[in-house]
Amino acid sequence: MVKLAFPRELRLLTPAHFTFVFQQPQRAGTPQITILGRLNSLGHPRIGLTVAKKNVRRAHERNRIKRLTRESFRLRQHELPAMDFVVVAKKGVADLDNRALSEALEKLWRRHCRLARGS
């Protein structure tokens, strides 16, 4: 049985981890969300989240977006390539309901899987 935990080693924790991804990212995006990815040498994917107050004003909306994004990553972690991902929320993401946000994230994870196989 596959473990679907979300331990500390699956998270980008330091500014250096985020900078590594921002230097040479592979991009996959929608008008509301962009996922940047860069191959790592760890053998497993990691995720970092950026949901700016400028783009999503209310704290409960920012928390909802982060919670759904982490859950989407947690459920797909074994299908994803060994990459570091940074999920960037843009203006309008708060207007998506939970289902639309989950579907958008699934589409972007699939696109990153295709990009990783192609490179």
UniProtKB/Swiss-Prot annotation:
Keyword Nucleotidyltransferase: no
Keywords: Endonuclease, Hydrolase, Nuclease, RNA-binding, tRNA processing
Keyword tRNA processing: yes
PANTHER family cross-referenced by the UniProt entry: RIBONUCLEASE P PROTEIN COMPONENT
Record InterPro entries: Ribosomal_Su5_D2-typ_SF, Ribsml_uS5_D2-typ_fold_subgr, RNase_P, RNase_P_CS
Gene: rnpA
GO biological process, one term: tRNA 5'-leader removal
UniProt GO cellular component terms: ribonuclease P complex
Job description of the protein: RNaseP catalyzes the removal of the 5'-leader sequence from pre-tRNA to produce the mature 5'-terminus. It can also cleave other RNA substrates such as 4.5S RNA. The protein component plays an auxiliary but essential role in vivo by binding to the 5'-leader sequence and broadening the substrate specificity of the ribozyme.
NCBIfam families hit by this protein: rnpA
Reaction(s) this enzyme catalyzes, per UniProt: Endonucleolytic cleavage of RNA, removing 5'-extranucleotides from tRNA precursor
Similarity field: Belongs to the RnpA family.
Coiled coil: none
Protein name: Ribonuclease P protein component
Oligomer status and interactors: Consists of a catalytic RNA component (M1 or rnpB) and a protein subunit.
GO molecular function, one term: ribonuclease P activity
EC number: 3.1.26.5
